[in-house]
């Protein structure tokens, strides 16, 4: 494990934005503070470094986001959309919505960045506007194993169930 200094972390960035099926994140962005994060977050990005892979046509995909291509990560990103994951259940009431203050209370003394998502306080899918955040947690050590990475994110989700359960594997 490689020690991390302060609240620094590394994101891996694509040269596209909002492309749902993008899997290539070849550009490294060292985050030392809010300004660096704001610059990197303008583009599709991930918290883990991934190796190159081949697509079905045999073409190389640089820094391919995939579990088998996981190399390392020094931060964990979690989402909180304040929505009910079970479509059969009623929507969450506003008094159940979580904010950065709730995350800070759940993780006392743990540094994190809270970034409003692009749908923060916007109506979406027929649901009323609500707070939606991406949370970035700089790690004290670099994780270099996909199973350990997924276990860390799963543990964070178990500790704070309001985090989105769809983004806890090593390919997220």
Positions of PLM-derived features:
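Amphipathic alpha-helical coiled-coil/leucine-zipper-like oligomerization segments
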Residues: 152-156
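Signature for HUH/AEP ssDNA processing cores
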Residues: 1-133, 137-151
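Flexible helix-coil linker/hinge segments at domain or subdomain boundaries
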Residues: 157-172
């Amino acid at each position: 494990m490689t020690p991390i200094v302060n609240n620094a972390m590394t994101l891996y960035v694509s040269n596209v934005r909002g492309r749902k099926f993008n899997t290539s994140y070849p550009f490294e962005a060292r985050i030392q503070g809010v300004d660096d994060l704001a610059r990197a977050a303008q583009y599709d990005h991930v918290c883990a470094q991934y190796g190159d892979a081949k697509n079905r046509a045999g073409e190389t995909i640089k820094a391919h986001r995939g579990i088998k291509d996981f190399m390392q990560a020094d931060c964990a990103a979690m989402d909180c959309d304040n929505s009910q994951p079970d479509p059969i259940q009623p929507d969450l009431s506003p008094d159940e919505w979580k904010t950065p203050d709730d995350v800070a209370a759940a993780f006392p003394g743990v540094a994190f960045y809270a970034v409003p998502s692009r749908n923060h306080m916007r109506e979406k899918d027929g649901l009323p506007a609500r707070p939606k955040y991406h949370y970035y947690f700089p790690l004290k050590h670099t994780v270099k194993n996909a199973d350990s990475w997924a276990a860390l994110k799963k543990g964070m989700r178990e500790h704070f169930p309001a985090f989105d359960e769809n983004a806890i594997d090593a390919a997220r």
